Swiss-Prot record:
InterPro entries: FBPase_C_dom (IPR044015), FBPase_class-1 (IPR000146), FBPase_N (IPR033391), SBPase (IPR023079). The keyword Magnesium applies. It catalyses: beta-D-fructose 1,6-bisphosphate + H2O = beta-D-fructose 6-phosphate + phosphate. Homotetramer. Keywords: Carbohydrate metabolism, Cytoplasm, Hydrolase, Magnesium, Metal-binding. It is an enzyme of class 3 (hydrolase). Mg(2+) 2 binds at residues 96, 99, 232. Pfam families: FBPase, FBPase_C. It is found in: Cytoplasm. Mg(2+) 1 binds at residues 78, 96, 98. This is Fructose-1,6-bisphosphatase class 1. Pathway: Carbohydrate biosynthesis; gluconeogenesis. The gene is fbp.
């Protein structure tokens, strides 16, 4: 893989992570391809969810992989109660080993989300994010100064494009229970559909955000506080912002930036809106003051 696009203070750690992913992504794919990979275990993770077998196997593999990095002092999986720490290193990695596990049995797109933090697990310390999606092909998307998309082919990641969102998209991925949507959100969605937007929601956050990014615009929303800040929300918020989109939530009817949020507990959750500029403007118009 050609790493010349990665520059700046945090380029080296990103390159090291990508190099490990390039070597290990086939192993990850093998874990997902096992016949019983989507079977539920009898366990409960720290968030109260019941993980599937692939969750735990992939988690173990990724934890060992990331801990092998000399400059990583802490590794934290969504499946664990607390981080695993080492004595030395400057960076911390928080990751969701298998986002979309609930739809894996239907053979939908799933993926791994990775957030790279410096010194502490805070949104303000998030310096890069990555995700890998597993489908009929494997893709890697990396956010550092810009957002780069790669496809895995013949044991290497090959550059596809730099992702920049357009002002206005054509797809929406609106997650959550619609009966609990606010009146403003319902009106915003009705307006999008009236403008011939297409609904593209799969139940896998990484897949739906990937779709918005690849199509160069649109909106992902999850208004209920269900998504975990450190492992899902912050990394994908950075991804969308670096692609010239907006990542926000509403606090008593006031639109606020997701990456300005604090973290009171490791597994704290948040509502989440990720959008290109036009969709962000429409959402603010309808949800402002609610």
């Amino acid at each position: 893989m050609d790493y010349k696009r990665f520059k700046g203070k945090h380029a080296n750690i990103v390159i090291e992570i990508i190099s490990l992913l390039e070597k290990g992504v086939k192993k990850a794919q093998e874990i997902l391809e096992k016949p019983d990979a989507g079977s539920y275990t009898q366990l409960e993770n720290s968030s109260g969810d019941t993980p599937i077998k692939a969750d735990l196997a992939l988690d173990k593999f990724l934890e060992e992989t990331f801990l092998s990095l000399e400059n990583v002092k802490s590794v934290f999986s969504e499946e664990k109660e607390t981080p695993v720490t080492k004595e030395n290193g400057s960076y911390l990695i928080a990751y969701d080993p298998l986002d979309g596990s609930s739809v894996m049995e239907a053979n939908f797109l799933v993926g791994t989300i990775i957030g790279v933090y410096e010194k502490d697990y805070k949104a303000q310390n998030l310096v890069a994010s990555l995700y890998v999606v597993f489908g009929h092909k494997i893709e890697l998307v990396v956010a550092l100064e810009e957002v780069y998309r790669y496809a895995f082919y013949q044991n290497k990641f090959h550059f596809i494009e730099t992702i920049v969102l357009e002002n206005k998209g054509k797809i929406i991925a609106s997650g959550g229970n619609q009966k609990d949507f606010s009146l403003g959100l319902k009106k915003a969605l009705e307006g999008f559909f009236a403008e011939n937007y297409r609904l593209r929601y799969s139940g896998s956050m990484v897949a739906d955000v990937h779709h918005v990014l690849v199509k160069k615009g649109g909106m992902f929303s999850y208004p209920q506080k269900k998504l975990r800040k450190l492992f899902e929300v912050f990394p994908l918020a950075l991804m969308v912002e670096k692609a010239k989109g907006e990542a926000f939530y509403f606090d008593k009817g006031v639109k606020k930036r997701l990456l300005d949020q604090s973290v009171e507990s490791y597994h704290e959750k948040s509502e989440c809106y990720l959008a290109s500029p036009h969709e962000a403007q429409i959402l603010e118009k309808h949800l402002k003051g609610e």
